[in-house]
UniProtKB/Swiss-Prot annotation:
Its EC number is 3.6.4.13. ATP-binding RNA helicase involved in 40S ribosomal subunit biogenesis and is required for the normal formation of 18S rRNAs through pre-rRNA processing at A0, A1 and A2 sites. Required for vegetative growth. It is an enzyme of class 3 (hydrolase). One of its GO terms (biological process) is rRNA processing. This is ATP-dependent RNA helicase DBP8. Belongs to the DEAD box helicase family. DDX49/DBP8 subfamily. The lineage of its organism: Eukaryota, Fungi, Dikarya, Ascomycota, Pezizomycotina. It comes from Pyricularia oryzae (strain 70-15 / ATCC MYA-4617 / FGSC 8958). Residues 7-21 have a biased composition (Polar residues). The Q motif is unique to and characteristic of the DEAD box family of RNA helicases and controls ATP binding and hydrolysis.
Length: 579
């Protein structure tokens, strides 16, 4: 049996962008790799127990192109419909991958890199601890008194009882730090990791102030995605009970006319995505939007995404259109909340205030040292790019994962669509969530996942922010995000509110620098994924090479023929023209 090559350097610590090819296996493209596999298969028929060896350093396909932001209406680049490789039959398969990711050393060890001496895990752990301790000295922390209650923060009894009915009995750190200050009339910038209760931190004081002085369109809440807007809408309704709250949900994918009517009726709270609200400001007329000119509260939830100027999916132009009709900052309370406090968010601390108004209150709770909770286990699986789907299938079939609720994150809508088709053909209970789906289909798919009718959700970054699904046990990064902050939002879908969770990252050759950047951002190294009695490489070789390759062809054919998941052809609307 051929031995797996040992101690293979995955990627050099220099800035060379191209992978290093071994001299003995000079193939530079997927087609060359396919030819080499065919030659080996011919040799198998004549020589017994001959093993096929695939080089881990072969080029990645177009699936690893630059990531694109998931805004409401952005288009994504289609995946490369490359020529399918022939499935490898029964011969065994050797994956040449190093057992550990080579990480950068701690400060003071630069000389050791030049000598080729790796840094031990213990040294890396010490470096991470020292960085975390240094960062902790500079943060503004909310009170941590365990005896703090909502009553002591000034919350009225009816709201305290409403929260108790929702099993919310004690305020979290971000709620302790913000609710009292918002009730005093201060603008607020709140930063706290995912799952820490940021929605309640701004919903409670808004509802209390509204009950004291009700008026039309008392507050506008802007957020990054339709699903998050719907969730905030539902949470406002739940917290405001037993009182009847007149709220309007203004998001893309829904009927503009009914939304315009709802705005014209002066709801108490407007929850919206910036793009759709900007559409109404441009086209629905003054009678519809005049209520926005007297708003008392403006909330930017996921403020880092809303204020980001990166890429073609930036929402800043829509935000500017919305701000143009709202009262000036000195005449309203402005609240910004996010899990990742960016320089753009912090810059708003200098917003002008009217004379006598207190300065902006900034509360950051565990946004640097504890960007992810301690209850989240991070791990990685190193694999060959051409067999990513095979590893995913076998990972989902392991004993520990057969009953767990799992979200699989990808970078592009085309990948999400492909995996939805493929995993359904492989008999997994799966659904998907991405920007190419109709809005009602997005709501239905998310509902199926929440209700456990589907245990796997394949999603782009539209599902990475704010969604609270307590049952999610595992987050799989099928494609690693290009921005470490996006990683924090993705893995924040699990291990919420003190629960345990797991984040598993699929790492190809070119992903190692991304892993190192993520580890630096979250302050903790990832561990190699392990499960007792499970060897994914062996399972892929033994069970999945032929099966998954066949189903992959079928999935691609279904997509090409415009079939729905499950094989039915999509209905085409016929347009009848006059002859």
């Amino acid at each position: 049996m051929a031995k797996i090559k040992s101690q293979r350097q995955l990627v050099s610590m220099t800035k060379d962008s191209s992978p290093r090819q071994p001299a003995s296996e000079p193939h530079s493209s997927d087609s060359d790799s396919s030819d080499e596999e065919s030659d080996h298969l011919d040799a198998v028929s004549s020589r017994k127990k001959r093993k096929l060896s695939v080089d881990f350093s072969q080029e990645e396909g177009d699936d690893e192109d630059d990531n694109q932001d998931e805004s409401d209406d952005d288009d994504d680049v289609d995946e490369d419909g490359g020529k399918m490789k022939q499935p490898v039959a029964k011969p065994t398969f050797a994956f040449n991958a190093p057992s550990r990711i080579k990480r950068h050393p701690a400060k003071g060890d630069s000389e050791r890199i030049g000598k080729g001496q790796p840094v031990t895990d213990a040294e890396m752990e010490d470096a991470v601890q020292s960085v975390a301790q240094a960062a902790g000295k500079k943060r503004i922390l909310a009170p941590t008194d365990q005896n703090t209650t909502f009553e002591s923060l000034g919350v009225e009894p009816w709201l305290v009882q409403s929260l108790a009915n929702l099993a919310v009995k004690r305020p979290t750190g971000i709620q302790k730090g913000c609710i009292g200050e918002i009730l005093k009339g201060r603008d607020c910038i709140g930063g706290s990791r995912t799952g820490s209760g940021k929605t309640i931190a701004f919903a409670v004081p808004i509802l209390q102030k509204y009950a004291q002085d009700p008026s039309a369109i008392f507050a506008v809440v802007l957020t990054a995605t339709r699903e998050l807007a719907l969730q905030i809408y539902e949470q406002f309704k739940a917290v405001s009970s037993p009182h009847v709250l007149k709220a309007a949900l203004i998001i893309g994918g829904s009927d503009m006319r009914s939304q315009a009517i709802a705005l014209a009726q002066r709801p108490s709270i407007v929850i919206a995505t910036p793009g759709r609200l900007a559409d109404h400001i441009r086209s629905s007329g003054e009678d519809t939007i005049c209520g926005l000119r007297r708003v008392k509260f403006l909330v930017l939830d996921e403020a880092d995404r809303l204020l980001s100027s990166k890429g073609p999916g930036s929402m800043l132009p829509h935000i500017d259109e919305c701000m143009a009709v709202l009262p000036p900052p000195e005449d309203r309370q402005t609240l910004l909340f996010t899990a990742t406090v960016t320089p753009e968010v912090r810059a708003l601390k200098e917003m002008p205030t009217r004379p006598g108004k207190e300065p902006v209150h900034v509360c950051e709770v565990d946004t640097q040292v504890l960007a992810i909770p301690d209850s989240l286990k991070q791990s990685y699986i190193q694999l060959t790019v051409t067999h990513r789907e095979h590893f995913l299938h076998e990972f989902l079939l392991t004993a520990a994962n057969t009953e767990r609720s799992i979200i699989i994150f990808v970078n592009r809508t085309s990948t999400a669509q492909f995996l939805h088709h493929l995993l359904r053909l492989l008999d997994h209970r799966v659904t998907s969530l991405h920007s190419k789906l109709r809005q009602q289909q997005r709501i239905d798919n998310l509902g199926r996942f929440r209700a456990s009718a589907a245990r796997i959700l394949v999603a782009t970054d539209v599902a990475s922010r704010g969604l609270d699904i307590p049952e999610v046990s595992v987050v799989v990064n099928y494609d690693l995000p290009r921005d470490p902050d996006d990683y924090i939002h993705r893995v924040g879908r699990t291990a919420r509110a003190g629960r345990k969770g797991e984040a598993v990252n699929f790492v190809g050759q070119r992903d190692v620098e991304l892993v190192l950047a993520i580890e630096k951002r979250v302050g903790r190294p990832m561990e190699k994924w392990e499960e007792e009695g499970v060897n994914l490489e062996t399972r892929v070789i033994r069970d999945s090479l032929k099966l998954v390759s066949e189903k992959k062809r079928e999935a691609l054919l279904n997509i090409e023929e415009n079939r729905e998941v499950g094989g039915r052809r999509k209905r085409q609307k016929l347009k009848l023209g006059a002859e």
